């Protein structure tokens, strides 16, 4: 695709915003796609929802709304667009379909999965419910629609503790993230029956890495995602969802910060917090990185990658997500 004066004029304001985190030579490749996608989504009355782990050219260049999983679910339920294109992974697109079943929901790469989502099935949940009758099931939103259909209430990392406390019970089944389950257990008096799922991004971090970063960067603030191992969270200054991490940086404006999460977060947030120095030992999510501008353009042009679900699954799974949204953060 050609970078011409028309493209330059339309996309220059975006590049001025992200130039500190993107070389010009890279921008010249992205800009024509951004121009065409932004034009096409208006023609088709499409909205692009992007997760916080998307790369800057997507997050700042074409997304109409960028957020964590909880806010994306809420936004999907409110949009007046005819088409929802999810710049995220498969379970996020499914959740958007649950919240707007009459909309056309598209995912640019149907293989953009999630290690947490693939760690458990609806059948697994049914077996757990048989083993622990009467114990409510709380499922992380990072799960398939089949799992959500067997769930009492969903949660995200932003509201997991609040959701569990709201049930007013002594015991819950919490699926599928084992580390998030341990984090919730540390913040409540509820007995947690967990699953052995992990996020391949956050599982790679370790306590020694955190301590070395702190040693070499006096005064640094280290903020971690609750999907990290417990010892990493303990060694950090703050633990929170992606939105919680963004708000921490925005509100506290630390001189130096390390975000113990996916790599693109630091790039995206630095754009809006130029006075903060981001120390970047981070890990890449291979699933999120399957979403690219060329794939988004192709998906939007041809309306491929549509999320299709049967009505029974939608009806059952939607209830658990609606309960989560109603409880909020």
Predicted regions and their residues:
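Active-site loop-to-helix "anion-binding N-cap" substructures in soluble metabolic enzymes
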Residues: 2-259, 265-329
């Amino acid at each position: 695709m050609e970078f011409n004066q028309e493209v330059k004029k339309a996309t220059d304001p975006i590049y001025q915003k992200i130039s500190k985190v993107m070389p010009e030579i890279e921008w010249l490749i992205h800009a024509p796609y951004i121009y065409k996608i932004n034009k096409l989504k208006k023609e088709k009355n499409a909205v692009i929802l992007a997760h916080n782990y998307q790369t800057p050219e997507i997050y700042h260049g074409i997304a109409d709304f960028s957020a964590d999983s909880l806010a994306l679910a809420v936004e999907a339920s409110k949009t007046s667009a005819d088409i929802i294109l999810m710049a995220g992974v498969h379970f996020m697109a499914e959740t958007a379909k649950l919240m707007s079943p009459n909309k056309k929901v598209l995912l640019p790469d149907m293989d953009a999965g999630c290690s947490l989502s693939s760690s458990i099935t609806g059948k697994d949940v049914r077996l757990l419910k048989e083993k622990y009758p009467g114990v409510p099931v709380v499922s992380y939103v990072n799960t398939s629609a089949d799992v959500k259909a067997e769930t009492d209430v969903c949660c995200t990392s932003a509201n997991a503790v609040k959701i569990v406390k709201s049930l007013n019970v002594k015991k819950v089944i919490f699926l599928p993230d084992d580390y998030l389950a341990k984090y919730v257990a540390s913040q409540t008096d509820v007995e947690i029956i967990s699953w052995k799922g992990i996020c391949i991004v956050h599982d790679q971090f370790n306590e020694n890495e955190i301590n070395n970063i702190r040693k070499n960067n006096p005064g640094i603030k280290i903020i971690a995602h609750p999907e990290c191992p417990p010892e990493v969270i303990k060694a950090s200054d703050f633990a929170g969802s992606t939105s919680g991490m963004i708000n921490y940086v925005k509100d506290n404006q630390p001189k130096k910060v390390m975000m113990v999460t996916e790599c693109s977060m630091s790039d995206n947030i630095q754009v809006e917090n130029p006075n903060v120095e981001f120390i970047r030992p981070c890990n890449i999510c291979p699933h999120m990185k399957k979403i690219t501008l060329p794939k988004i353009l192709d998906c939007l042009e041809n309306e491929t990658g549509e999320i299709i679900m049967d009505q029974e699954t939608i009806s059952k799974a939607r209830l658990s997500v609606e309960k989560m949204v109603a409880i909020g953060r």
